[in-house]
Structures are given as structure tokens and as C-alpha cells.
Amino acid sequence: MDTWHDALGGEKQQPYFQEILNAVRQERLSGQIIYPPAADVFNAFRLTAFDRVKAVILGQDPYHGAGQAHGLAFSVRQGIRIPPSLLNIYKELETDIEGFSIPAHGCLTAWAEQGVLLLNTVLTVRAGQAHSHALLGWERFTDTVIRQLATHRKHLVFMLWGGYAQQKGRLIDSQNHLILTAPHPSPLSAYRGFFGCRHFSQANSYLSRHGIDPINWKL
């Protein structure tokens, strides 16, 4: 199993998946603003090939502000103000990774291109309404993504931040992969243990131990 098509082709033919796409399409046609734009919904898969995934960072649903979401969890387009959770991720990187300095942008495409799958468990959202598409069925699809990676790949790093993401740990065999957990980087919880978690250096140590090139986290 080498490609996302191999891993997910059957899933995308399932009636529930077609129903999700139709529901989102109908909302867009009715004039509802949906993020990210239609062309960006599956960017995480476009930028990070199945056989090149090294690490998975799980988000919840996309940013719901104008111009923010572009299909990668926690990431925003160049020129968009860095959101608070991402700024806290940068602050942790600054203390964890030697030579990392906080960039002036929040675009994480460079990570995705190196094999960091930035996966939101829900892939769309209505403008200004967090979790508005939480019940559409996206999680059934993204649970399959996690399960397929955990089953058909070896020595991946899964970063699960916050209770919601940590529920997905049940889909992953910790004998074959590294599961790193911490509180969410949100300003509400970052000081309860996200700061100081050192997940990024731990990820690189694990990858190196298994003969896999580490990730250059610098942006």
C-alpha cells in the first residue's frame, strides 16, 4: 500500500463519504461560506504522500476566520496573522529545537512537504461557526486515515494534543509507532504541560533511531 488512493479509494466510494461531499457542496451553493475553499479541503493529502508520512499532527476542525484555513491543521496562509495556538507551538519549538526562531508567518507547508501530515479530524467548517460540521461524518473518514497509516506504515510519530486528539490513540498500535500526548497548545491549556513537552525533538530522536531522516522544523 503506497498511495492515498490505495489506502482510501474504497472509503471514498462509500455512500457516507459522498453524502458529506454533497452536503458541503449544497451549503456552498446556498451561499454559505465554508472554509477552507473547495480546492484546499484535501491539501494535507496532496502535500504529504502516504508513503512519505513521518509524523501526524492532529487538529480538530479548520480555522473559521476569513482567509485562514487552507487544508493543513494549525497552519494559515502567508500574510495571515499567526493564530494563538500556532504561536504557542512556535514558542515550544523555540525552546525544544536548537536554532529555531519564530517566523513571521504561520504557513506550515514546508513541514507537510517533508512528511508531516497536518490532519484535521473534521475537514470543513462554516464561516464563524466552530465545530459546525462536526456531525457531517468527516471523523469516520479521518479515523480511517489514521487507522490505515497505523496499520500499513511503521515507525510514525503521532502527536496528540488535548483530550479530543488523544481519543484517537485507540486507533494506533503503540508497539509500531510513537504516540506523544500533551495538553492542547491553546492559550487555555498550553501552560498545563504543552510547554515543555519537547515533542519535536522526541519525534526526531525516534525517527533517527529507526533510520528515518529527521524533520527540519525550521520555517
Swiss-Prot record:
PROSITE patterns found in the cross-reference section: U_DNA_GLYCOSYLASE
One MF term in the entry's GO annotations: uracil DNA N-glycosylase activity
Record GO cellular component, one term: cytoplasm
Substrates-to-products reaction catalysed: Hydrolyzes single-stranded DNA or mismatched double-stranded DNA and polynucleotides, releasing free uracil
Gene3D superfamilies: Uracil-DNA glycosylase-like domain (3.40.470.10)
Active site: 61
EC top class named in words: hydrolase
InterPro entries in UniProt: UDG_fam1 (IPR002043), Ura-DNA_Glyclase_AS (IPR018085), Uracil-DNA_glycosylase-like (IPR005122), Uracil-DNA_glycosylase-like_sf (IPR036895)
Entry keyword annotation includes Hydrolase: yes
EC numbers, comma separated: 3.2.2.27
Pfam families in UniProt: UDG
Location of the protein in the cell: Cytoplasm
Gene Ontology BP term (one): base-excision repair, AP site formation via deaminated base removal
UniProt KW keywords: Cytoplasm, DNA damage, DNA repair, Hydrolase
Family according to the record: Belongs to the uracil-DNA glycosylase (UDG) superfamily. UNG family.
Function description: Excises uracil residues from the DNA which can arise as a result of misincorporation of dUMP residues by DNA polymerase or due to deamination of cytosine.
Protein name per the record: Uracil-DNA glycosylase
